[in-house]
Amino acid sequence: MNKPTDTKMKRITILLIVLLCVMGFSEFKKDKSEVRKASVSTTAQRMEQQGLVNIKSVDPTIKIALMYARTDNFLKKMLYKDLREAYFLPRCATSLKKAQAELKRLRPDLSLIIFDATRPMSIQQTMWNAVKNTNHYFYVSNPKNGGGMHNYGMAVDISICKASWNEKLWKDSAKACSIDTIPMGTKVDHMGFESHIDKEQQLLAKGILTKERFENRALLRRVMKEAGFTPLRTEWWHFNLCTRAWAKANLKVVK
């Protein structure tokens, strides 16, 4: 006589269990999202909101050592207060993955290492203010002219290091950081003719650039060009994925 009642109670119990499971899963997702949000810097969150992606989510094998998150750069100061990740527009990130794959095909013992990625225009202004009245002004794009490709998420400052180098050795501090890069003749960020790729034959002839370093630069350009990047004449480490005119016409400046 109690079977209908028992069946009804079972249904109610099952519905309650399902409801509790759904609510629990929802809270789990919310908690997980909150934890991730707390672990991602404010600048990184702002970049993601502008459609940029963390290169590690596209290719975790590419090494990162942002030079402007340290003081050993040409300004001798830390410009990125909280940013430690390398962000790019998806198209640029995909191209970097292709470049890394090409390098691995040629030299499995090596890896690309990123020294600067997307750069907010506010940081660009700080850099421009430091060089605008010096002989080095042409190394930094003037924000009033729309900035450079770093400000659009379509450029990278990059080199090559040993694949065995441990990223955990890189820390955001004023102390010197040893990065196992292959020799390129100058450090990344060197403002001088030794960094100019159109001067390399002369540098080689004069013994300023060794054959090994000349070939290392050529290797970097080879893998980057294979992925669609164009080198910058005055900086062996800088590569653009599009022209300034195209970026200004089709993209938004990263703030």
Each model region followed by its residue ranges:
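Bacterial Sec-dependent N-terminal signal peptides
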Residues: 2-34
